[in-house]
Curated annotation (Swiss-Prot):
Localization of this protein: Membrane
Source organism: Arabidopsis thaliana
Keywords: Amino-acid transport, Membrane, Transmembrane, Transmembrane helix, Transport
Stored PANTHER family: AMINO ACID TRANSPORTER (PTHR22950), TRANSMEMBRANE AMINO ACID TRANSPORTER FAMILY PROTEIN (PTHR22950:SF692)
A biological process term (GO) from this entry: amino acid transport
GO cellular component: organelle membrane
Entry protein name: Amino acid transporter AVT1F
C-alpha cells in the first residue's frame, strides 16, 4: 500500500449527527487534570475553510505552482491538507485511538469535501502530496509580512496625535502582543486538534467562543479591504488631484473617482479561482516596507526636505487615537497560529515572534520619528501624501502605496467569501461558480460603499485597532489561555494575563470612544 493510501486509511468517518472532542491536560505531578469536552453538531465547525484561506492569504505554506498545467490551486490545497497529517504523527495517532465517538476538532475529511466543492474538484483531485513546511527564515519573513503592513504609513500621524511619548505605548504594545502570541502557541501545543485561532476559541469557550472569534477575525479582514480602497484612492488623488466628474447631476471629486476606479481594478482579481500568484506577490510585503522607509529617509536626507526638532511631548486629548493606530500596527494574531503550524521547527516559534516584532517596532519607530520630524504638525494620515511629488523617491513611494493593495485585496477578502459560502445551502446550484462570483462582487461593492462613506484612513485604522485588535490581540489570547490551561498556571502567569486583559479593556474603550467621536466630527465637517 502506498503512502497516500496509508494516510487515507487513518481517517475516521465523521458522525453525521454530532462530534465530540476530548482535550485533556495533566500536570507534572499527575495529581489532577483539567479536561475539556466539546460536543457540537457539524454546523459547530464553521468556519471549516478558515485555515486554508489564511494559508493562502499569508503564503505560510507556499504551493508548488504549475501555470502550464493549471493545477496550482489543487496543489496549494493539497499541500495545506497534507500538512495536517504530517505535522505531529504521534499526536495525530493518539487523537484517533481514543474511541470512535471522539473526533478531531475539525474533520480533515470534511475539509477535503468542502474545499473540493469550492474549487470544483473531486476529492481524488486533492491528493495528499508532500507538505511544504517553512524554514526558520521563511517563518520570520511571514511573521514580518503579517505584522508590518499598511499601518506603517500612518505611524508618523500617530506620533502627531499622541506626542513623542506615545512611542512608549507603541513599545509596550509590541511587548504585550508578542507575549500574547506566545500564549496562542501554548494553547496550540495543548492539543494536536488545535490548528487555528477559532479552534482555540472553541477549546476554551465552546462553539460560542469559536463563533465570536471567527466573526472578529473576518471583521478585521473586511476593514483591511476598506483600508486598501482608501489607501489607493488617497495616493492616486495625490498624483492626480484636480479630477472631477459629473454623472447625472452627481459631482464626484478626485478621491471618490479613484475609490471607484480602485474598486474596479481589484474586482477582477477577486473573481480569480487561482490566487497563488497574488499570494507570492503579497509575500514580498517585508521588502515593500523597507522600500517605503528608505524612500521617506531619502526624501528627508538627500532631497533636502530635512529633519526638524520640536513637536509635542504628550497630547493626552488625542492619545487614544494614537493608541488605536498602534494597536492596528500589531493586529496579526489572526494568522500567527498558521505560521506556527507551518514551521519545520515549531519550537523556534517564540524566536520567530521576537525577531518579527522587533523588526516591526524598529521600523515603526524609525518611520514615525523620520516622518514627524520632516513634516511636523502638517503630517497627514499617510506619510506618502506629504512627500513632494517632484522627487523620484516620492513617486516610487506613492506608486508603491497604490500597487501593493492591488495584490493584497483579493487575498484578504477570500477568507470572508469562503466563510459565507459555507453558510449557503449545500446544493450544487448554490455552490456554483456563478453564486461565488455574485457573493464576491457584493462584498467588493460593500467595501467601496464603506470607503466612500468613511474615507478616513487613520481614523478607520484607529477604530480597528481600538475595538478589534485589542479584543483579538490582547483580551482573547489571555482569556483562552486561562480557560484552556486553568489549574496549571502560576499566580504570576494569571496576574500577567489579568493585567493584559484590564489594559486591553481600558485602551480599547478609550480608543474606540475617541475614534468614533473623531469619525463623527469628520463626517459633520464633510456635510458642512
Amino acid at each position: 500500500m502506498d503512502l497516500e493510501e496509508q494516510e487515507r486509511d487513518i481517517l475516521i468517518q465523521t458522525d453525521d449527527d454530532d462530534c465530540h472532542v476530548d482535550v485533556s491536560y495533566v500536570n507534572d505531578d499527575d495529581d489532577s487534570n483539567a479536561s475539556f469536552s466539546l460536543s457540537q453538531n457539524d454546523s459547530a465547525f464553521w468556519p471549516q475553510s478558515y485555515r486554508h484561506s489564511v494559508d493562502l492569504l499569508t503564503g505560510v505554506t507556499p504551493p508548488m505552482v504549475s501555470f502550464i498545467q493549471g493545477r496550482s490551486t489543487e496543489t496549494s490545497f493539497s499541500s495545506s491538507i497534507a500538512s495536517l497529517y504530517k505535522r505531529r504523527p504521534t499526536s495525530i495517532a493518539n487523537s484517533f485511538v481514543s474511541s470512535t465517538s471522539k473526533q478531531p476538532l475539525l474533520s480533515e475529511k470534511d475539509d477535503v469535501s468542502f474545499l473540493s466543492s469550492q474549487v470544483g474538484l473531486s476529492n481524488t483531485d486533492l491528493s495528499y502530496g508532500e507538505p511544504n513546511f517553512c524554514s526558520f527564515p521563511q517563518s520570520v519573513l511571514n511573521g514580518i509580512n503579517v505584522l508590518c503592513g499598511i499601518s506603517l504609513l500612518t505611524m508618523p500621524y500617530a506620533v502627531k496625535e499622541g506626542g513623542w511619548l506615545g512611542l512608549c505605548i507603541l513599545l509596550s504594545f509590541a511587548i504585550i502582543t508578542c507575549y500574547t502570541g506566545i500564549l496562542l502557541k501554548r494553547c496550540l501545543e495543548s492539543s494536536s486538534d488545535l490548528r487555528t485561532y477559532p479552534d482555540i476559541g472553541q477549546a476554551a469557550f465552546g462553539f460560542t467562543g469559536r463563533l465570536i472569534i471567527s466573526i472578529l477575525l473576518y471583521m478585521e479582514l473586511y476593514v483591511c479591504c476598506v483600508e486598501y480602497i482608501i489607501m489607493m484612492s488617497d495616493n492616486l488623488s495625490r498624483v492626480f488631484p484636480n479630477i472631477t466628474l459629473n454623472i447625472v447631476g452627481v459631482s464626484l471629486d478626485s478621491p471618490q473617482i479613484f475609490a471607484i476606479s480602485a474598486t474596479l481594478i481589484v474586482l477582477p482579481t477577486v473573481w480569480l479561482k487561482d490566487l497563488s500568484l497574488l499570494s507570492y506577490l503579497s509575500a514580498g510585503g517585508v521588502f515593500v516596507s523597507i522600500l517605503l522607509a528608505l524612500c521617506l529617509f531619502w526624501v528627508g536626507s538627500v532631497d533636502g526636505v530635512g529633519f526638524h526638532t520640536g513637536g509635542k511631548a504628550l497630547d493626552l486629548a488625542n492619545l487614544p487615537v494614537a493608541i488605536g493606530i498602534f494597536g492596528f500596527g500589531f493586529s496579526g494574531h489572526a494568522v500567527l497560529p498558521s505560521i506556527y503550524s507551518s514551521m519545520k521547527e515549531p519550537s523556534k516559534f517564540p524566536l520567530v515572534l521576537l525577531i518579527s516584532f522587533g523588526f516591526c517596532v524598529f521600523f515603526y519607530i524609525a518611520v514615525a520619528i523620520c516622518g514627524y520630524s520632516m513634516f511636523g504638525e502638517a503630517i497627514q494620515s499617510q506619510f506618502t501624501l506629504n512627500m513632494p511629488q517632484q522627487y523620484t523617491a516620492s513617486k516610487i513611494a506613492v506608486w508603491t502605496a497604490v500597487v501593493v493593495p492591488m495584490t493584497k485585496y483579493a487575498l484578504a477578502l477570500t477568507p470572508i467569501v469562503l466563510g459565507l459560502e459555507e453558510l449557503m445551502p449545500p446544493s450544487e446550484k448554490m455552490r456554483s461558480y456563478g453564486v461565488s462570483i455574485f457573493i464576491k462582487t457584493i462584498l467588493v461593492l460593500s467595501t467601496l460603499v464603506v470607503a466612500l462613506t468613511f474615507p478616513f484612513f487613520a481614523i478607520m485604522g484607529a477604530l480597528m485597532g481600538s475595538f478589534l485588535a485589542t479584543l483579538v490581540d490582547f483580551i482573547f489570547p489571555c482569556l483562552c489561555y486561562l480557560s484552556i490551561l486553568k489549574g496549571r498556571l502560576s499566580k504570576t502567569q494569571i496576574g500577567i494575563c489579568v493585567f493584559i486583559i484590564i489594559s486591553g479593556i481600558v485602551s480599547g474603550c478609550c480608543g474606540t470612544y475617541s475614534a468614533i467621536g473623531r469619525l463623527v466630527g469628520e463626517l459633520n465637517w464633510m456635510v458642512q
